[in-house]
């Protein structure tokens, strides 16, 4: 087993924090921080987000479930794996199961925690928890949030790998667990 290399040896000291704005999905703050060598940075900006989940979901016949939806940050419609925010009081697994059902109508199967990533450890406080589930079945229609418009489709795994290799799955926090899946790090 690999030794844990993440530690607090060079931890910065937060001298003060000022919240610039707070919204349900994003909070921004300005910290005054002291570095280990004693230098002070009077303006270090941190984005506080809730933790997220995403799901690599395979049907009983081995096809992958993808969604396509418009993403305003890129100004494009993108392929994605099911994903969403962990609601207060939920575990990552509970959130992953809920998001898969809400976005696709699929449920069940054998669930496995796949990987956990930081979107940007330099400026963001949250983590993304990825799951792999095999053997899911369609049990209902979608139950989308007001701003969601997700086109769900099932694809052979080879096609999803081709999408990934050709930069058609752009979200890094979705691409990383897919690369892990396809390159045998199961």
Q: Predicted regions span which residues?
A:
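Charged phosphate-binding loop/patch that engages nucleotide di/tri-phosphates or the phosphate backbone
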Residues: 174-186
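Acidic, metal-coordinating catalytic segment for phosphate/diphosphate chemistry
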Residues: 16-54, 60
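Hydrophobic residues on conserved beta-strands that form the core of alpha/beta folds
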Residues: 14, 28, 41-43, 67, ...
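Extreme N-terminal tail/first-helix region
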Residues: 1-22
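A glycine-rich, hydrophobic loop/mini-helix early in the fold
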Residues: 49-76, 80
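Short beta-strand micro-motifs in enzyme catalytic cores
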Residues: 27-31, 77, 127-129, 151
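Unchanged
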Residues: 42, 52-54, 59, 85-173
